[in-house]
Regions:
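Short helix->loop/beta-hairpin flanking segments within DNA-binding domains
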Residues: 19-37
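C-terminal all-alpha effector/ligand-binding and dimerization domain
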Residues: 113-259
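HTH-adjacent hinge/linker in prokaryotic transcriptional regulators
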Residues: 2-19, 47-48, 58-134, 138-139, ...
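A short alpha-helical element within helix-turn-helix/winged-helix DNA-binding domains
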Residues: 36-50, 63
């Protein structure tokens, strides 16, 4: 009889300054260090983590590169204002009122931030396998892709790629190379494809080169990926959107009741 060997004790193989940055990052993300709060002094951090001055400074530099803290010569390092943002996915299906901007822009303005959407590309393409499956397409079937970059205070916030079946998008503003007033949810309603519900698949991944560059990521942090499939009341998928956000700057808030 073979006796299974015990699993070796887990050990964090990251360098010390990365581990220190991870713990301080958690303090910031959890609100233990709220916006504007001073981080512990170098002496306090040395004592807490049993680390040298140089190691503490390397850890703080990581957080500065991630735009989580700000430090000035002769002043304490502080947690930056408005760094972590909460996204409420349920808002995505809310149509804009006539003449009103896309709800995402309105919500950002309520929090005192300047938000805008940059349309990167509109093209007909063969979508990746997960999008084909989501839209019920066969291998070789094409879809219309609208790529956008969402920015808050001129910093990239989210890379968005939305795919639409050709029979829905053909000869409609979905194929136009300009932004859609009120958002695609409003347009789909006008086209007779009223969004009824959506399904989100959320995962944390290592960023691709495109995502790393588009979001101006500071280092080897994961990105938060959401694949959202939008359905009509009769269950037809009419849109599949891949959304990518910097994992250290955003969280998702879901509200639901028991089935």
């Amino acid at each position: 009889m073979t006796v299974p060997m015990a699993e070796p004790e887990a050990h964090d193989r990251r360098s010390l300054h990365e581990r220190i940055a991870a713990d301080l990052r958690d303090d910031i993300m959890s609100g233990e260090l709220p916006p504007g709060a001073n981080l512990p002094s170098t002496a306090q951090l040395r004592s807490r983590f049993d680390a040298s001055n140089a190691t503490i400074q390397k850890a703080l530099q990581l957080l500065k590169d991630e735009r989580l803290v700000v430090g000035r010569a002769g002043a304490a390092v502080t947690a930056r204002e408005h760094r972590q943002r909460t996204i409420r996915p349920a808002m995505s299906l809310t149509p804009a009122a006539p003449g009103e901007p896309y709800p995402w822009l309105t919500e950002a303005a309520k929090h005192g931030t300047d938000a805008r959407i940059a349309l990167l590309d509109v093209t007909e393409t063969n979508p990746p396998a997960d999008i084909r499956t989501a839209l019920g397409l066969r291998h070789g079937d094409a879809a219309v892709l609208r790529s956008q970059l969402l920015l808050i205070d001129d910093e990239p916030a989210e890379l968005v790629k939305s795919y639409y079946p050709l029979d829905i998008a053909r000869d409609t503003p979905l194929m136009d190379h300009h932004r859609i007033k009120g958002g695609t949810s409003t347009l789909l309603r006008q086209l007779g494809h009223t969004p009824h519900h959506c399904v989100d698949r959320v995962s944390a991944r290592v960023p691709t080169q495109e995502q790393f560059e588009a979001l101006r990521l500071p280092g080897s942090l994961p990105v938060l990926c959401t694949l959202r499939i939008v359905y009509t009341a009769d269950g037809r998928p009419i849109e599949a959107t891949a959304m990518v956000k910097a994992g250290h700057l955003y969280e998702l808030q879901y509200e639901f009741a028991p089935e």
